[in-house]
Amino acid sequence: NPYNSQYTRGLEDSTISGFGEMQTRLKVNIWGNDSGSSAMAIMPFIKFPTNAEELENDDVEGGVTVPIGFKLPMDLNMGFMTEFDFNRNAAEDGYHTEFINSITLSHSIIGELSGYVEFFSNITDGDRSEWIGTIDAGLTYALTKDIQLDAGMNIGVTRSADDFNPFCLYFY
């Protein structure tokens, strides 16, 4: 992320700003993509610690994402995603694996505006790991072929998930 600003609210409010980490990824289409009723890709990625102090960790991390998408009747789209992340552990003495999965159902509302619902799951192989599960809903708007706005709410359905996490993002 080129520039980050994190605001934390608690006993003492704080704001941290600066240059974020840099991630590079490669997308290999297995089938589909621009045409057809389904698509699948494999996307390995690696994160480099180019961030300002305290914004992120200072470690190289990476993983692989496998998204699969289907066009359904009535202009519905369904997506599945599996991801394996190899991240530095909290003690900073090794790495752990995170297993991330999601299933998404989306529908065009009008023009370039679409809505979606999603179930998200994150399980870590660490000793004290807890399952994070959320039900998410949001809107996406395609500004151009390569730029998309995304706003919504993630609602935790497990104890370790945040109760509510509103978000507003842009992708390019």
Task: Label every model-predicted segment.
Residues 1-172:
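Transmembrane beta-barrel domains of Gram-negative outer membranes and organellar outer membranes
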